[in-house]
Swiss-Prot record:
NAD(+) binds at residues 69-74, 103-107, 127-128, 140, 149. Its main location: cytoplasm. It holds the Pfam family DHQS_C. It comes from Pseudoalteromonas translucida (strain TAC 125). Its cofactor is Co(2+); Zn(2+); NAD(+). The keyword Zinc applies. This is 3-dehydroquinate synthase. It comes from the Bacteria. Belongs to the sugar phosphate cyclases superfamily. Dehydroquinate synthase family.
Amino acid sequence: MLELSVNLDERSYPIYIGQSTLQDNGRLVHHIGDCRPIIITNDTIAPLYLQGLLAQLATLNPLHFIIPDGEQYKSLTWFEKISAFLLENNCGRDTCLIALGGGVVGDLTGFVAACYQRGIPFIQMPTTLLSQVDSSVGGKTAVNHPLGKNMIGAFYQPQAVFIDTQSLHTLPAREFAAGMAEVIKYGLIYDTELFAYLEQNVERLQQLDEACLQHIIYRCCEIKALIVAQDEKEQGLRALLNLGHTFAHAIEAQMGYGVWLHGEAVATGMVLAAKLAYTRQDLTAEDVTRISGLIAQYSLPTQIPAVMTSEHFLQHMRKDKKNKKGTIRFILPTQFGQCALVDDVSDDQVRALIEQ
């Protein structure tokens, strides 16, 4: 088993990566402490892992709550339903929520934990590649609003993150590909060696080679932990983790949450960001081809939805959380392994990019 830490002084916490970490009863019970565990999962993951986890925690009198599977359920409606469940079961501050599932379960559970009785502990047990390499680490919790993704949320760190690579063997191929978009992102913003590794190991990763999986998950979590330790509340450096997301959130909001997977939207968003960087002479045409080529190799989309216009993009981008004083700000690659936050992209440049 691999282990690393997110260093945030008294709120630091470990990340455990390996096979069968979902069965690591000793560590899990240690992090639950004297609390009563409440497992939050969805109706896809529950048949696979819920009973095993309940059996492990039987002496702690656990409860569970199951939500439907899908991005559209990361909402205030389901936030309220989980909160009502906790209240109906007289759950106090000595309650520990366990998020067993992908990014939707993790974000929703974390937001409930942040708000319920002004904050209770929670543990992340991510079961998708995207949540393992990105959303489970760093304390971003949120629900979506019809007018924008992740618009209602809080920064709230978990007690621990348990990443079980075996869960990826039950993940649909489309979901695995979506997770690879976030892995590629880390290579683009921070680590040229990781990007090259992804180019060299496409087949091994798609075959779920254990050594390859542990390598990329560990490296992504390591990068995320380093960035979060320096900029927990996304005032500067952490914003670079949003490469491709300005475009991606516009796609998700316009198309309807769940129509495009988050990773699919991020993949296309990174291609658009690379093309925009090319127009600014920060990347070469060969760089753009290399980026879009790797994204395509992992069976991810590189073209925007045919029904979306430049005005659709601009409408949603004007609500982006990175904006300042009404100016849309983008994360753009300046070279492989480096990105920058820019605020001098005009609406006409966006229109030209989308309409080309």
